[in-house]
C-alpha cells in the first residue's frame, strides 16, 4: 500500500506548511518522467494481480474467531525463509517445481491492517494463453506459503472484511484498549494498524486535516426483528477522552446506520487488483479509459461485503466505506461552510471513482468529460509548459488538488529528480477505481494501468477467474478497437448503484449501446470492423465518410449486469424480467461473447480453451444469477444460522461458523478435494459454486461441442454488429 519510506513523519500542522512544496516538487518529478518515458515502447503486454488476505486465529475448540495482529512476525518469517520452500500439504508438485526453479515464488507485502497480508506473483504475467491457466495455481501457492509461515491456528482467508471488527469485546489477538491517540476510535485500538510510521500518521493526519474523525455510516439491513428506528447500540455517547468524541454527540451517528469512525474500517478491507503494463503510453491511456466504465459492473458482480461491525448492512460492497474512511476533506471543501481558508469545494473523497478520461482517442467526445471537474490551473499550466498534452495535464492537475498526507522531514532537504517520491506522495494517495501509473524514475518498466474496484473472492479459483477475465477484456478491447465510452458522471452514478443489495440482479447500469468502431471505406461509405477483425462494408456508399454525431444521450442506456456481461439475447432468455430498455436494433453483444469471439480469432489448443471457458462460465453464471455472489451467500448463511434472531446482529457464534466454513472451503480447494462433502453441512454452497469446485469439465461434449459453442457465440456478436451497422 503506497510508499513505505522511513524517516521523521510530520504531524498535520507541520505537514500542511510543506504541502505546496511537495506538490511543486512532485510536478517537477512528473515532468522528468514524462520527458524521459513519453516515447517509451514495450514489446510485450505484462500484467500482475494483488491478493489481500485477512489473518485469523481460528480453532474449533475455541468459542470465537479473532483477527491475528502478527503481521510483522509473519512477514519476518517469510523474509527469513531463504527459499520459501513449501512444506506441508500444498498442491502436488509445488515444492519440487519450486526447488527445480520452475516456479517463481511470490512476494509478500504489509498492508494497513496489522491483521492483513498482500501477495503478488514473483514476476509479471505475460499474455500467453497457457500462462493464464497458471494464475490459479500461483494464487494457491501464495496462500499455502503464507499459511506455512503462520501459527497452526492462524489462517489466511480472502473475505473482504472481518464481520466483527470494531464490535464490543475482544476481536483481536492480542487485544488492546480502544480510544488511542492516533485513531481516537471508539471501536478499534491504535494497535490494529501497521506500526510503520506511515500508517498511524496517515490515519492521524486525515483526522486532523478534517477537523474531526472520519464518518463511515452504512445503512443497516432491516430484518423482521430489527428495532426501527435503529440506533447503533455500540456507540458510546458518554466518552470524553478526546475532543473528537464530541462527533457522535453532534450527529455523526444517525439512526438506521452502522457507525464507524476510523480508517481501519476502510483500509482494513481486502480486494483484488490487477495492473497492466501497456506497450506504450497511448495504449495505456486507451486501456485506462475503456476499462473505467467496466469498474462499477465488476464491483457489483464481485460483491462480497454485507456485514460491518457485527451487523448486516443494506449494501453489498466495500467501496464507499473505504471512501469515507480516508476522506480528509474539510467542512469548506465538503460545502458545509463557505470557502474561506480552502481553495475549492471538492465533490469526492480522495478514494473515489475516476473523474477523468485521458486517451487521445478521437472518439472521446467533450460531452463525456466531467463539466464540474476541479483542477489546479497553475499546475495544469506548468504541465502544459513542460510539453504535456491538455488531456493528461488536466488529469494530473485534478489529482494534485489534494494535499500530501504523510511527509517525511528528511525528504524536504533537496529536490531529487532521480526519484519519484514527491509525485507518488500525491499519486498513490489518490485511490480512484482506475490508476494511471507512469514508469519509475529509472524508466525500467513501462506505462501501467491499475484496475482497482473488484472485491476479493472466497476461493483462489474465483479470484483467478476474475483476474483472467479482465485480462481477456483488455485483449478484446485492443484487438477489436472497442468503444465503451459513456459520460464520466454516469460512471459515478453506476458506482453508487453497485452498492445496492443484490445490485448485480436487481439494478440497471448505464452502458454504451454499440461498442463497435465505425470505419470509413475508400469510396466514402462506412464500414464496421467485426469481432474477428475483418472489415465489412455497409450498404449505401452514398453515406458521408464521417456521419454526424448524434446526441450523447442516444449512445447509452440502462442495462442489467447480465446484459452487459452475457449480452441482450442471453439476458432475455435467462432473466425473469425482459430487458425493456433495449429497443429494436439496440441489442448489446455482451462482454463474454466479445471475449470468446476474440479467443476464436487466435490460435489456441482445445485444452487451453476449455480451461479459460471454465473461468468465463463462472462469470457468466454469476452475472445471470444462476450462481450467487459472495455477498448473497454470506447473507443467506447468516439468515439460516440457528443462532440468528432476525435482528440484523451477527454474533460471535455466527462469525466463527462463517469463518470456519470459509477456511474449510479453502483447505479443500488447496488439496483438490472438492466441496461435495461440505454440501449439506454448509448451506447453499452449490448456489455459490455450482459444479466448479467438483472437478467437472466445462467441455463435457468434447471438441465438437466446444467448436459449435464458439461458432454460436461468434454468430451472436456478428449479428448484433450488423444490426448496429444497419442503424447507422
Swiss-Prot record:
Please list the GO terms describing molecular function: ATP binding; glutamate-cysteine ligase activity
User: Amino-acid biosynthesis among the record's keywords?
Assistant: no
InterPro entries with a match to the protein in the record: GCS (IPR004308), Gln_synth/guanido_kin_cat_dom (IPR014746)
Reactions catalysed, as given in the entry: L-cysteine + L-glutamate + ATP = gamma-L-glutamyl-L-cysteine + ADP + phosphate + H(+)
* Gene3D superfamilies (alphabetical): 1.10.8.960, 3.30.590.50
Q: Which GO terms describe its cellular component?
A: glutamate-cysteine ligase complex
Q: What class of enzyme is it?
A: ligase
Q: In which residue ranges is the amino acid composition biased (Low complexity)?
A: 523-536
Q: Name one Pfam family in it.
A: GCS
* Keywords attached to this entry: ATP-binding, Glutathione biosynthesis, Ligase, Nucleotide-binding
The Enzyme Commission number assigned here is 6.3.2.2
Pathway entry: Sulfur metabolism; glutathione biosynthesis; glutathione from L-cysteine and L-glutamate: step 1/2
* Positions in coiled-coil regions: none
Q: Which PANTHER family match?
A: GLUTAMATE CYSTEINE LIGASE, GLUTAMATE--CYSTEINE LIGASE CATALYTIC SUBUNIT
Question: Of which family is this protein a member?
Answer: Belongs to the glutamate--cysteine ligase type 3 family.
The identity of this protein, by name, is Glutamate--cysteine ligase
Identify the taxonomic lineage of the organism of origin. Answer: Eukaryota, Fungi, Dikarya, Ascomycota, Pezizomycotina
Encoding gene per record: gcs-1
Amino acid at each position: 500500500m503506497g510508499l513505505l519510506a522511513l524517516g521523521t513523519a510530520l504531524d498535520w500542522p507541520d505537514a500542511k506548511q510543506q504541502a505546496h512544496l511537495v506538490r511543486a516538487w512532485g510536478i517537477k518529478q512528473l515532468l522528468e518522467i514524462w520527458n524521459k518515458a513519453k516515447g517509451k515502447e514495450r514489446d510485450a503486454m505484462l500484467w500482475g494481480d494483488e491478493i489481500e488476505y485477512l489473518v485469523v486465529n481460528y480453532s474449533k475448540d475455541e468459542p470465537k474467531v479473532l483477527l491475528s495482529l502478527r503481521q510483522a512476525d509473519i512477514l519476518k518469517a517469510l523474509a527469513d525463509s531463504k527459499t520459501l520452500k513449501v512444506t506441508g500439504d500444498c498442491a502436488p508438485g509445488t515444492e519440487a517445481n519450486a526447488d527445480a526453479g520452475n516456479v517463481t515464488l511470490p512476494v509478500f507485502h504489509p498492508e494497513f491492517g496489522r491483521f492483513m497480508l498482500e501477495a503478488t506473483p514473483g514476476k509479471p504475467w505475460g499474455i500467453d494463453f497457457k500462462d493464464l491457466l497458471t494464475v490459479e495455481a500461483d494464487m494457491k501457492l501464495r496462500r499455502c506459503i503464507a499459511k506455512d509461515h503462520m501459527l497452526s491456528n492462524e489462517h489466511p482467508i480472502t473475505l473482504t472484511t472481518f464481520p466483527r471488527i470494531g464490535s464490543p469485546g475482544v476481536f483481536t489477538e492480542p487485544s488492546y484498549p480502544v480510544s488511542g491517540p492516533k485513531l481516537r476510535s471508539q471501536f478499534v485500538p491504535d494497535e490494529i494498524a501497521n506500526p510503520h510510521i506511515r500508517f498511524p500518521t496517515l490515519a492521524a493526519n486525515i483526522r486532523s486535516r478534517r477537523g474531526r474523525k472520519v464518518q463511515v455510516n452504512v445503512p443497516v439491513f432491516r430484518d423482521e426483528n430489527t428495532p426501527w428506528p435503529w440506533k447503533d447500540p455500540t456507540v458510546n455517547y458518554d466518552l470524553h477522552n478526546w475532543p473528537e468524541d464530541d462527533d457522535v454527540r453532534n450527529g455523526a451517528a444517525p439512526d438506521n446506520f452502522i457507525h464507524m469512525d476510523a480508517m481501519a474500517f476502510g483500509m482494513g478491507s481486502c480486494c483484488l487488483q490487477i495492473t497492466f503494463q501497456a506497450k506504450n503510453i497511448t495504449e495505456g491511456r486507451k486501456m485506462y479509459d475503456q476499462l473505467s466504465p467496466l469498474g462499477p459492473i465488476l464491483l457489483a458482480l464481485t460483491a462480497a461485503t454485507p456485514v460491518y461491525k457485527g451487523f448486516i448492512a443494506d449494501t453489498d460492497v466495500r467501496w464507499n466505506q473505504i471512501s469515507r474512511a480516508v476522506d480528509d476533506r474539510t467542512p469548506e471543501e465538503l460545502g458545509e461552510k463557505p470557502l474561506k481558508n480552502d481553495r475549492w469545494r471538492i465533490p469526492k473523497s480522495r478514494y473515489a471513482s475516476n473523474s477523468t478520461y485521458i486517451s487521445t482517442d478521437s472518439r472521446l467526445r467533450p460531452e463525456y468529460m466531467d463539466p464540474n471537474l476541479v483542477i489546479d490551473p497553475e499546475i495544469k499550466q506548468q504541465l502544459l509548459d513542460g510539453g504535456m498534452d491538455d488531456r493528461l495535464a488536466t488529469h494530473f492537475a485534478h489529482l494534485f488538488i489534494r494535499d500530501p498526507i504523510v511527509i517525511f522531514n528528511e525528504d524536504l532537504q533537496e529536490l531529487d529528480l532521480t526519484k519519484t517520491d514527491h509525485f507518488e506522495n500525491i499519486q498513490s494517495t489518490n485511490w480512484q477505481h482506475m490508476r494511471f501509473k507512469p514508469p519509475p524514475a529509472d524508466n525500467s518498466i513501462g506505462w501501467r494501468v491499475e484496475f482497482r474496484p473488484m472485491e476479493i473472492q472466497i476461493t483462489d479459483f474465483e479470484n483467478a477467474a476474475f483476474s483472467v477475465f479482465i485480462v481477456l477484456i483488455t485483449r478484446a478491447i485492443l484487438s477489436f478497437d472497442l468503444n465503451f465510452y459513456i459520460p464520466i458522471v454516469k460512471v459515478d452514478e453506476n458506482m453508487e448503484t453497485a452498492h445496492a443489495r443484490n445490485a448485480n440482479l436487481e439494478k440497471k447500469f448505464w452502458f454504451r449501446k454499440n461498442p463497435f468502431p465505425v470505419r470509413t471505406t475508400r469510396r466514402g461509405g462506412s464500414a464496421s470492423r467485426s469481432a474477428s477483425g475483418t472489415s465489412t462494408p455497409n450498404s449505401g456508399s452514398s453515406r458521408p465518410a464521417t456521419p454526424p454525431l448524434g446526441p450523447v444521450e442516444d449512445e447509452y442506456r440502462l442495462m442489467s449486469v447480465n446484459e452487459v456481461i452475457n449480452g441482450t439475447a442471453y439476458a432475455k432468455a435467462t432473466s425473469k424480467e425482459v430487458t425493456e430498455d433495449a429497443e429494436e436494433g439496440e441489442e448489446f453483444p455482451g462482454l463474454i461473447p466479445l471475449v470468446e469471439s476474440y479467443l476464436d480469432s487466435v490460435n489456441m489448443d482445445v485444452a487451453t480453451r476449455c480451461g479459460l471457458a471454465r473461468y468465463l462460465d463462472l462469470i457468466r453464471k454469476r452475472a445471470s444469477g444462476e450462481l450467487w455472489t459472495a455477498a448473497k451467500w454470506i447473507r443467506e448463511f447468516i439468515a439460516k444460522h440457528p443462532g440468528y434472531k432476525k435482528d440484523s446482529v451477527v454474533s460471535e457464534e455466527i462469525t466463527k461458523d462463517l469463518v470456519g466454513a470459509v477456511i474449510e472451503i479453502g483447505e479443500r480447494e488447496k488439496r483438490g478435494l472438492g466441496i461435495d462433502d461440505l454440501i449439506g453441512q454448509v448451506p447453499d454452497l452449490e448456489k455459490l459454486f455450482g459444479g466448479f469446485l467438483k472437478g467437472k469439465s466445462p467441455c463435457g461434449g468434447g471438441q465438437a461441442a466446444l467448436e459449435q459453442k464458439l461458432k454460436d457465440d461468434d454468430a451472436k456478436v456478428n449479428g448484433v454488429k450488423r444490426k448496429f451497422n444497419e442503424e447507422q
